[in-house]
């Protein structure tokens, strides 16, 4: 049976869906919020490239069962099929920023993600 997951119909949905899936321990679902060739600037000072590698990163992350709080988004900037989303971080990261792209079906996926501005 295929698991049906909610999709992001607005760029702002991505943060909420990420937090919900992280708190459920759904690493695969978290990674499905990213394009296949997405780049994440994490761990600090490194880049994780591609959804497969991002999935592996999230599997390690959720193994420790962290709890993520929902951060209040800053206003989203949209230009055509690109959107810049950002939130002030509830932890020591300072801020978070992502670039999302509208998909052909009208949903949104992350292309670039910088979840931590410390390094």
Give residue ranges: language-model regions.
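Short glycine-dipeptide loop
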Residues: 36
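A beta-strand edge to alpha-helix "cap/lid" segment located at domain peripheries
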Residues: 1-29, 39-119
């Amino acid at each position: 049976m295929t698991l049906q997951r909610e999709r992001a119909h607005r760029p702002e949905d991505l943060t909420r869906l990420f937090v919900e899936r992280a708190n459920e321990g759904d690493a695969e679902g978290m990674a499905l919020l990213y394009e296949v060739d997405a780049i994440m600037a994490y761990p600090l000072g490194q880049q994780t490239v591609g959804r497969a590698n991002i999935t592996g990163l999230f599997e390690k992350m959720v193994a420790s069962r962290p709890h993520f709080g929902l951060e209040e988004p800053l206003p989203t900037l949209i230009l055509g099929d690109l959107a810049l989303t950002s939130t002030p971080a509830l932890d020591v990261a300072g801020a978070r920023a992502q670039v999302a792209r509208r998909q052909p079906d009208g949903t949104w996926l992350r292309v670039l993600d910088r979840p931590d501005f410390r390094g």
